[in-house]
């Protein structure tokens, strides 16, 4: 990748203060912040300070008080950065501060009112206005929108916004997000629509400090690719990337305040309200502490990175401590131009948070970036589009559907043409209509046909010619009397088939032309929709505006330098007209030095207290992690077998890209195991698991204690029962004793089981016996039905 290296430049830091809210005024809070716009200084007064304690003063690149407008911040600070992005640099703008100090207002503002629009909508307008005024350049603008919620990266433009994305790193391109969606936009309306879709899926919630507070860090990424023909006749591509960051608000849980209802962060269309860094007593509860802990960790990691970069003594920069710092790696000390907007609250109850934000921003001033132009990268989408357009154009020229247009002087205007058949519904293709100018007189000739009109005309003419030719051939076949009817029919069918093939080819050509125009419409070409002299006037106005902003910046720097020079002059001046004058001058100097000494002592004391507070927070976090670790070890030692624990430990590996421990898959990635293996049986040959001791006991004997099945062994009687018939005469009366003897004899013969006995199904012994019949019917039943030995009843 070729690049134009530029000398290192410092990260630009500006401070902005909002006015007191009605709620703060009603509560009686006083204003403790003083902004000096000309000198770029912020003075913070401690409301709990002892008498005689001096306020703290911080100096920044620019300062905007409560009366400042959105346009002032954008024109003086952000506009030069957007111009650099259009030239091929990487740029980042992010707002940092306490929750409710106006970070989202600074970044987004109110979209419906032009005067209240923030950095993001003004950047949209700036980018596409610049493209429309450019000459002989092709642009491709892409947009992506993501958020970091509880250290998980989510794509806000995806159909599944809750899906977790992976963070990867390429040695050539740097850090990137795998499977992050990107949309090509052609105007301000489309890119605003993309952002509104993402805002609907962003996580926001309510806290004591802000009713609509951002619960995630949101990053809107705009990639601008520009192609321009150089002096060598080759097309050179520049790629600029703009990161617009809206940080979430961290929480200080130990600060008093009414609790708000808990619950998970909601999905709202507000796009975040509070957003931002610093510590905040927001009175959050429920799921908010969990969100706040993740936000605090990421912002603490951001502070550690800035401290390491500003100190110039650390060889290791902890970019990998959080997802936020890894994504902003180029923006902090890398290949980017970065602007940090520190938003402040003027109320007395926010003294600690404002002081923390000011110290954070003051450290960030010392960070040095090394921005360079990203020229001719390998993975540009614009180059792919140009190659695809050239291929489609060659196919159309081969089919004769695309003719060469003569070169002419033209004043161009833009026209919207509805999409042809085969193009997605509702799409609009931008066609450029050129009108020739007559050099002799100022009259315009009729407008020349557009590319789409020329294509449609060529297609219609070609189809009409082929149809006429086929009709003539069909008529000639009909008139030819030398042909047999079967041959005529066959030839006519061939002609009809040729006509159908012609129509299908025509449809394929139309689809190809539609694809060509769709690809070409995504490339924005400047200088075609506004008069050239108007473009020049607008460019002059922008240059004047930039000169005024640059003059203000130089004036501010000169005033700061004059103050330093005055102090040095007073120290160097050693001649006095009298002893009284010398005493007065040295007394004044002594008071000033004593005030500086007291300020340094107070700063040291504040730093010591902050160090103790940070150390206590770290100790508390360490103790909490130690308790969780002990609990997990206790569960593992008591509930997980050692062999299973060893299996789990053997599968663990460290993912260096994400800094996380992960499990190796059970089946290797290269093995194609289409059939799933069967689960191993616990006891082969048995229905239930049986111990080894029970198996040995079963082999030694048939003790039922060790058997899982077939506990009892019973011999099966397979001989069928014998059934015999008894016949009695109803009129003959017999002696009961004779009947009894006959029954006994028949019973003996039954026990002998003769082979001639009839086999019938009998009732089992376990069935309940039926009620015996009356005595008068016994003989009749015995005479009419066979008698079973078990059913013989003596009624004597």
From Swiss-Prot:
<dbReference type="GO" id="GO:0005874">
    <property type="term" value="C:microtubule"/>
</dbReference>
<feature type="region of interest" description="Disordered">
    <location>
        <begin position="251"/>
        <end position="292"/>
    </location>
</feature>
<feature type="region of interest" description="Disordered">
    <location>
        <begin position="397"/>
        <end position="421"/>
    </location>
</feature>
<keyword id="KW-0547">Nucleotide-binding</keyword>
<dbReference type="GO" id="GO:0003777">
    <property type="term" value="F:microtubule motor activity"/>
</dbReference>
<comment type="subunit">
    <text>Heterodimer of KIF3A and KIF3C.</text>
</comment>
<dbReference type="GO" id="GO:0005737">
    <property type="term" value="C:cytoplasm"/>
</dbReference>
<dbReference type="GO" id="GO:0030424">
    <property type="term" value="C:axon"/>
</dbReference>
<keyword id="KW-0206">Cytoskeleton</keyword>
<dbReference type="GO" id="GO:0071598">
    <property type="term" value="C:neuronal ribonucleoprotein granule"/>
</dbReference>
<dbReference type="InterPro" id="IPR036961">
    <property type="entry name" value="Kinesin_motor_dom_sf"/>
</dbReference>
<dbReference type="GO" id="GO:0019894">
    <property type="term" value="F:kinesin binding"/>
</dbReference>
<dbReference type="GO" id="GO:0005871">
    <property type="term" value="C:kinesin complex"/>
</dbReference>
<dbReference type="GO" id="GO:0035371">
    <property type="term" value="C:microtubule plus-end"/>
</dbReference>
<comment type="function">
    <text>Microtubule-based anterograde translocator for membranous organelles.</text>
</comment>
<keyword id="KW-0963">Cytoplasm</keyword>
<keyword id="KW-0175">Coiled coil</keyword>
<dbReference type="GO" id="GO:0010976">
    <property type="term" value="P:positive regulation of neuron projection development"/>
</dbReference>
<feature type="compositionally biased region" description="Gly residues">
    <location>
        <begin position="270"/>
        <end position="284"/>
    </location>
</feature>
<feature type="domain" description="Kinesin motor">
    <location>
        <begin position="10"/>
        <end position="367"/>
    </location>
</feature>
<protein>
    <recommendedName>
        <fullName>Kinesin-like protein KIF3C</fullName>
    </recommendedName>
</protein>
<dbReference type="InterPro" id="IPR027417">
    <property type="entry name" value="P-loop_NTPase"/>
</dbReference>
<dbReference type="InterPro" id="IPR001752">
    <property type="entry name" value="Kinesin_motor_dom"/>
</dbReference>
<dbReference type="InterPro" id="IPR027640">
    <property type="entry name" value="Kinesin-like_fam"/>
</dbReference>
<dbReference type="GO" id="GO:0007018">
    <property type="term" value="P:microtubule-based movement"/>
</dbReference>
<dbReference type="GO" id="GO:0016887">
    <property type="term" value="F:ATP hydrolysis activity"/>
</dbReference>
<dbReference type="GO" id="GO:0008021">
    <property type="term" value="C:synaptic vesicle"/>
</dbReference>
<dbReference type="GO" id="GO:0030426">
    <property type="term" value="C:growth cone"/>
</dbReference>
<feature type="region of interest" description="Globular">
    <location>
        <begin position="633"/>
        <end position="793"/>
    </location>
</feature>
<dbReference type="Pfam" id="PF00225">
    <property type="entry name" value="Kinesin"/>
</dbReference>
<feature type="binding site">
    <location>
        <begin position="97"/>
        <end position="104"/>
    </location>
    <ligand>
        <name>ATP</name>
    </ligand>
</feature>
<dbReference type="GO" id="GO:0030425">
    <property type="term" value="C:dendrite"/>
</dbReference>
<comment type="similarity">
    <text>Belongs to the TRAFAC class myosin-kinesin ATPase superfamily. Kinesin family. Kinesin II subfamily.</text>
</comment>
<keyword id="KW-0505">Motor protein</keyword>
<dbReference type="InterPro" id="IPR019821">
    <property type="entry name" value="Kinesin_motor_CS"/>
</dbReference>
<dbReference type="GO" id="GO:0005524">
    <property type="term" value="F:ATP binding"/>
</dbReference>
<feature type="coiled-coil region">
    <location>
        <begin position="378"/>
        <end position="632"/>
    </location>
</feature>
<dbReference type="GO" id="GO:0008017">
    <property type="term" value="F:microtubule binding"/>
</dbReference>
<dbReference type="GO" id="GO:0043025">
    <property type="term" value="C:neuronal cell body"/>
</dbReference>
<feature type="region of interest" description="Disordered">
    <location>
        <begin position="754"/>
        <end position="796"/>
    </location>
</feature>
<keyword id="KW-0493">Microtubule</keyword>
<feature type="compositionally biased region" description="Basic residues">
    <location>
        <begin position="401"/>
        <end position="416"/>
    </location>
</feature>
């Amino acid at each position: 990748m070729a690049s134009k290296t530029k000398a290192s430049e410092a990260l630009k830091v500006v401070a902005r203060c909002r006015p007191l809210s009605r709620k703060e005024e009603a509560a009686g809070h006083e204003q403790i912040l003083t902004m000096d716009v000309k000198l770029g200084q912020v003075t913070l007064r401690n409301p709990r300070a002892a008498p005689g304690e001096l306020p703290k003063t911080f100096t920044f690149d620019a300062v905007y008080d409560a009366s400042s407008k959105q346009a002032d911040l954008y024109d003086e600070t952000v506009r030069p950065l957007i111009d650099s992005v259009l030239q091929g640099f990487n740029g980042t703008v992010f707002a940092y501060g306490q929750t409710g100090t106006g970070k989202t207002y600074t970044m987004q503002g109110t979209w419906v009112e032009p005067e209240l629009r923030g950095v993001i909508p003004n950047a949209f307008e700036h980018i596409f206005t610049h493209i429309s005024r450019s000459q002989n350049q092709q642009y491709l603008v892409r947009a992506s929108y993501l958020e970091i919620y509880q250290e998980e990266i989510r794509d806000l433009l995806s159909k599944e916004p809750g899906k977790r994305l992976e963070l990867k790193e390429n040695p050539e391109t740097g850090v990137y997000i795998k499977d992050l969606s990107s949309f090509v936009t052609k105007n301000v309306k489309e890119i605003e629509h993309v952002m509104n879709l993402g805002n609907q899926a962003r996580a926001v919630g309510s806290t004591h400090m802000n009713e609509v507070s951002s619960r995630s860090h949101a990053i809107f990424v705009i990639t601008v690719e520009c192609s321009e023909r150089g002096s060598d006749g080759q097309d050179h591509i520049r790629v600029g990337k703009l990161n617009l960051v809206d940080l979430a608000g961290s929480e200080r849980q130990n600060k008093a305040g009414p609790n708000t209802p808990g619950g998970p962060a909601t999905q709202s269309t507000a796009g975040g309200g509070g957003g931002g860094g610093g510590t905040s007593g927001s009175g959050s509860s429920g799921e908010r502490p969990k969100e706040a802990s993740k936000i605090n960790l990421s912002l603490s990691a951001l502070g550690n990175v800035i401290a390491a970069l500003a100190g110039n003594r650390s060889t290791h920069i902890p970019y990998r401590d959080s997802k936020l710092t890894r994504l902003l790696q180029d923006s902090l000390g890398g290949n980017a131009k970065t602007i940090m907007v520190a938003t402040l609250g003027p109320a007395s109850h926010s003294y600690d948070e404002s002081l923390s934000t000011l110290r954070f921003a003051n450290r960030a001033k010392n960070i040095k970036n090394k921005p360079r132009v990203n020229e001719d990268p390998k993975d540009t989408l614009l180059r792919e589009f140009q190659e695809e357009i050239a291929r489609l154009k060659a196919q159309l020229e081969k089919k004769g559907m695309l003719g060469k247009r003569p070169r002419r002087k033209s004043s161009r205007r833009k026209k919207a043409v509805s999409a042809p058949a085969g193009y997605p519904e509702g799409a609009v293709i931008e066609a450029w209509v050129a009108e020739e100018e007559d050099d002799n007189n100022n009259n315009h000739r009729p407008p020349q046909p557009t590319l789409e009109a020329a294509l449609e005309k060529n297609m219609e003419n070609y189809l009409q010619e082929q149809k006429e030719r086929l009709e003539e051939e069909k008529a000639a076949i009909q008139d030819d009397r030398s042909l047999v009817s079967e041959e005529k029919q066959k030839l006519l069918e061939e002609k009809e088939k040729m006509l159908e093939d012609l129509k299908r080819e025509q449809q394929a050509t139309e689809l190809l032309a539609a694809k060509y125009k769709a690809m070409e419409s995504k490339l924005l070409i400047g200088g075609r929709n506004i008069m050239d002299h108007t473009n020049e006037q607008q460019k002059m106005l922008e240059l004047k505006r930039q000169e005024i902003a640059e003059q203000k910046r130089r004036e501010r720097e000169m005033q700061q330098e004059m103050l330093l020079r005055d102090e040095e002059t007073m120290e160097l001046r050693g001649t006095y007209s009298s002893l009284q004058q010398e005493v007065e001058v040295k007394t004044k100097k002594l008071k000033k030095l004593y005030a500086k000494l007291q300020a340094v002592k107070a700063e040291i004391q504040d730093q010591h207290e902050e160090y103790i507070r940070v150390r206590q927070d770290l100790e508390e976090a360490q103790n909490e992690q130690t308790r969780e670790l002990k609990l997990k070890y206790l569960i593992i030692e008591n509930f997980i077998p050692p062999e299973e624990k060893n299996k789990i430990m053997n599968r663990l590996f460290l993912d260096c890209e994400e800094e996380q421990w992960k499990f190796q898959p059970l089946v290797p990635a290269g093995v194609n195991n289409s059939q799933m293996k069967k689960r191993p049986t616990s006891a082969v040959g048995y229905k239930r698991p049986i111990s080894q001791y029970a198996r040995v006991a079963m082999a030694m004997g048939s003790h039922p204690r060790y058997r899982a099945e077939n506990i009892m062994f019973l011999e099966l009687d397979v001989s069928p029962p014998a059934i015999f018939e008894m016949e009695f005469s109803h009129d003959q009366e017999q002696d009961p004793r004779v009947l009894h003897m006959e029954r006994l004899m028949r019973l003996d013969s039954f026990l002998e089981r003769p082979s001639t006995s009839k086999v019938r199904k009998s009732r089992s012994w376990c069935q309940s016996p039926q009620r015996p019949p009356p005595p008068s019917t016994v003989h009749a039943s015995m005479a009419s039905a066979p008698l079973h030995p078990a059913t013989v009843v003596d009624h004597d």
